[in-house]
């Protein structure tokens, strides 16, 4: 997207006593390797940094992103730190393009080893629009958006987004504000309305809400603190909905505080080859208002190890628990769901666990684990190109979803979670869609099927971002 250009501090003369005449130039041996070494190790000073193309972007925002350039001591460091500064500027989301030019200093105050660095930038327009498609957990959607980037000159942005999907329709307005000099620290506010259809539960849900969140890093972890207030309207999706679903119909008001911690050392979010992910989330509802009260904990763990022949062994573990607070039972909208091509394969979407007349009610506790082996395609067709997006996939999944009696002790809870384990195994193909999503086509053999579970024995297709 951009290039770092640099001029030599000491250009090689083309004639003169140091080089010879043009006639005998072919008798002189030039050693570019030594010249390059001298150039790399020569001490330099960055005297000035110029910006061309700035409009509404504030100077203090820019100054924090390019400060390290002045600390460079040689040409290689100048080029490296200039490239890092360019990446930081692009990450702000206020420039369409950033180019870097490194040149020798000129002017009366120029020193012999002085350098000037120039960033040529192109700012985004005040209003931009977008149209794209997105892939969620076994759901596709069309997304229309309007964005006001760099609203006040310090990388703020306001976004309006409308999404129409196969199971969900939503629109929302959000405002994003990063901390100057520390983009990972940011604040955002969201207003939204989401209408979703959940055929596995014969349920329709409409959420109208507002949320505010703060994101910040601590050492190698990233944290999110969030408050959310949402008015939820639940209704029956079909006239044949069970009585248990009809009992859940109506309006509830949830006000909750949540905290999420993430440690991610993976080399990629989609089909990583190495690294680990740990994500822990806690949510407490009811103490800041509303008529829904609960404590909810869940986690996600993933480990990836690269093996011989470009194969990858991946293991993952999910788990969670929902504890109602007070006399009111938990809502179907807050419980966990399990099953489908993105979790325990070989079972239909969210069709494991408690159910009533064919409508799945979710559970207050669950766990799920998986072991996966990803290998290149046999005989490596399309190696180095399109073929590298495909992987063969061998998997073993297991999990359970249930309700707990919180009057019992932890031993009884663990025993309940260890009963009636559903598991499956199989093989298939995986297609990586950039670093955005992945598609799976697997042949699944479900095992440990319990009464009421809905299975998908044979070929199963899955699309999404988060997979077990």
UniProtKB/Swiss-Prot annotation:
Keyword Mitochondrion belongs to the record: yes
InterPro entries for the chain: Bac_surfAg_D15 (IPR000184), D15-like (IPR039910), POTRA (IPR034746)
GO biological process: cristae formation; mitochondrial respiratory chain complex assembly; protein insertion into mitochondrial outer membrane
GO CC field: mitochondrial outer membrane
Limits of the POTRA domain: 44-124
Annotated spans, Disordered: 1-25
Alphabetically ordered keywords of this record: Membrane, Mitochondrion, Mitochondrion outer membrane, Transmembrane, Transmembrane beta strand
Location(s) in or outside the cell: Mitochondrion outer membrane
Membrane topology qualifier: Multi-pass membrane protein
Transmembrane intervals: none
Source organism, top-level taxon: Eukaryota
Family the UniProt entry places it in: Belongs to the SAM50/omp85 family.
Subunit structure: Associates with the mitochondrial contact site and cristae organizing system (MICOS) complex (also known as MINOS or MitOS complex).
Entry note about domains: Its C-terminal part seems to contain many membrane-spanning sided beta-sheets, that have the potential to adopt a transmembrane beta-barrel type structure.
Protein name, as recorded: Sorting and assembly machinery component 50 homolog B
Gene: samm50-b
């Amino acid at each position: 997207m951009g290039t770092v250009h640099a001029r030599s501090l000491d250009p090689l003369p083309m004639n003169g006593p140091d080089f010879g005449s043009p006639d005998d130039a072919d008798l002189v041996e030039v050693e570019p390797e030594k010249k390059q070494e001298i150039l790399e190790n020569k001490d330099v000073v960055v005297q000035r940094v110029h910006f061309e193309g700035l409009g509404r972007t504030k100077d203090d925002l820019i100054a924090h992103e390019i400060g390290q350039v002045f600390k460079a001591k040689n040409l290689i460091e100048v080029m490296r730190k200039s490239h890092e500064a360019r990446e930081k500027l692009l990450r702000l989301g206020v420039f369409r393009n950033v180019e870097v030019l490194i040149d020798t200093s000129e002017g009366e105050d120029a020193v012999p080893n002085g350098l000037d660095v120039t960033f040529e930038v192109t700012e985004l327009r005040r209003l931009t629009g977008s149209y794209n498609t997105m892939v969620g957990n076994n759901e596709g959607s069309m997304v229309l958006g309007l964005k006001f980037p760099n609203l006040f000159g310090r990388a703020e942005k306001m976004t309006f987004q409308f999404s129409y999907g196969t199971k969900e329709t939503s629109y929302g307005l959000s405002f994003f504000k990063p901390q100057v000099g520390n983009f990972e620290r940011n604040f955002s506010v969201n207003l939204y309305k989401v209408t979703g259809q959940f055929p596995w539960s014969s349920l329709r849900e409409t959420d109208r809400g507002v949320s505010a969140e703060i994101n910040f890093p601590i050492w190698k972890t990233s944290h999110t603190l969030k408050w959310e207030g949402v008015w939820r309207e639940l209704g029956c999706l079909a006239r044949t909905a069970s009585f248990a679903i009809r009992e859940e119909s109506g309006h509830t008001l949830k006000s909750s505080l949540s905290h999420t911690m993430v440690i991610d050392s993976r080399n990629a979010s989609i089909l990583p080859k190495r690294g680990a992910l740990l994500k822990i989330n806690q949510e407490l509802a009811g103490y800041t208002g509303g008529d829904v009260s609960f404590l909810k904990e869940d986690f996600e763990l993933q480990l990836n190890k690269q093996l011989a022949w470009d194969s990858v062994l991946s293991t993952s573990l999910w788990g969670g628990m929902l504890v109602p607070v007070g006399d009111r039972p938990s809502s179907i909208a807050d419980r966990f769901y399990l099953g489908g091509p993105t979790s325990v394969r070989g079972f239909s979407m969210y069709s494991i666990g408690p159910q009533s007349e064919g409508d799945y009610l979710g559970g207050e506790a669950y766990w799920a684990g998986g072991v996966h082996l990803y290998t290149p395609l046999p005989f490596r067709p399309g190696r180095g190109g399109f073929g590298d997006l495909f992987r063969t996939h061998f998997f073993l999944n297991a999990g359970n979803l249930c309700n707990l009696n919180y009057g019992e002790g932890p031993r009884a809870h663990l025993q309940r979670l260890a009963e009636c384990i559903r598991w499956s195994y199989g093989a298939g193909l995986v297609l990586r869609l950039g670093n955005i999503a992945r598609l799976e086509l697997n042949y699944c053999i479900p095992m440990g099927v319990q009464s009421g579970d809905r299975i998908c024995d044979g070929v199963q297709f899955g699309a999404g971002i988060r997979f077990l």
